[in-house]
Regions:
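Conserved kinase catalytic-core segment
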Residues: 35-51, 97-163
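Structural beta-strand/beta-sheet cores of well-ordered domains, especially the beta-sheet scaffolds
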Residues: 1, 25-27, 58, 69-74, ...
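Conserved ATP-binding subdomain of kinase catalytic cores across diverse folds
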Residues: 1-96
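Mobile late-domain/C-terminal helix-loop "cap" segments
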Residues: 177-190
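Short beta-alpha connecting loops at secondary-structure transitions
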Residues: 168-177
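Generic recognition of well-ordered alpha-helical segments
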Residues: 88, 157-163, 175, 187
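Cytochrome P450 core scaffold surrounding the K-helix E-X-X-R motif
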Residues: 83, 163-165
Length: 190
């Protein structure tokens, strides 16, 4: 759900409203609905690990109740009450299914070279953390005020291996060195 939240007042309203009221922050809420796994708590712990590892992510938190914990993250596509122009890798290159294609797209649109480290960190963390939901809609680019494209903060970084699913479901969506499983350090560095 998209909402605008004022934590000081304990208030929120629909994020579909174009401009948030002063003191409200545009956020995305993921509700604690999974019966078998504490998915929102897992996503929050992955957020903390990723930030500690130097990955740029939007500020996030858990909203805990007696039996629930909802995950909230600030929206990166809003700045000062206005929409920020973004494009996913899927929008720029629909058939993109590899990290190589991600890096090629970033270079093609002129992302500053230093920001490619963000993409590399995310690739490594997706492999190490078991985030196999790394499809081309989970990588975005922002148009800066300077008119240049920039790597968007990472999002949807969480453990996504399903222990009850067939093995082929638990492969990475994007290939690394033509592999979706059994990815090695050599594959990451090639």
């Amino acid at each position: 759900a998209v909402v605008n939240v004022n934590f000081g007042e304990g208030q929120c309203y629909s994020g579909q409203v174009a401009t948030p009221y002063p003191g409200y922050t545009p956020m995305i809420v993921k509700f604690d609905e999974h019966q078998k796994m504490p998915t929102t708590r897992i996503e929050y712990s992955y957020y903390l690990m990723a930030v500690d590892a130097g990955l740029q992510m939007m500020p996030s938190r858990l909203l805990e109740g007696e039996q629930t914990a909802h995950f909230l993250t600030e929206r990166f596509d809003r700045r000062n009450g206005k929409k920020v122009h973004i494009q996913t890798l899927a929008a720029m290159n629909p058939p993109a299914d590899s990290y190589e294609a991600l890096f090629e797209a970033a270079c093609r649109i002129g992302v500053p070279p230093g920001e490619l480290r963000q993409l590399f960190r995310l690739m490594v963390l997706n492999v190490l953390g078991g985030n196999v939901d790394d499809h081309n809609k989970n990588f975005s680019f922002l148009m800066g005020d300077d008119g240049r494209w920039h790597v968007a903060p990472a999002y949807d970084y969480t453990f996504s291996v399903d222990p009850d699913a067939p093995y082929y479901v638990n492969r990475h969506s994007m290939t690394i060195n033509n592999r979706t499983e059994g990815i090695t350090a050599a594959d990451l560095l090639e």
